[in-house]
Amino acid sequence: MGRVRPRYIKSLGEKLLEMYPDKFTDNFEENKKAVAELADIPSKTVRNKVAGYITRLVKRRKAQEKAESAA
């Protein structure tokens, strides 16, 4: 079982993805750079966690869209 992310990571990731949906992909490295540009996060660790959460959300949405189109 995986680790639980803190609420502030989730809320920041969801907010950034909602505001800039075209800036994020399913590539962690690209998302890391985009988060650094868009949000003022002083900590590298927090930036990486937010980028990882956004990557996971994007992958989940793509899989969901693919499943809906196949059904």
From Swiss-Prot:
The gene is rps17e. Belongs to the eukaryotic ribosomal protein eS17 family. The keyword Ribosomal protein applies. One of its GO terms (cellular component) is ribonucleoprotein complex. This is Small ribosomal subunit protein eS17. GO terms for biological process: translation. It comes from Pyrobaculum aerophilum (strain ATCC 51768 / DSM 7523 / JCM 9630 / CIP 104966 / NBRC 100827 / IM2). The keyword Iron does not apply. Keywords: Ribonucleoprotein, Ribosomal protein. GO terms for molecular function: structural constituent of ribosome. SUPFAM superfamilies: Rps17e-like.
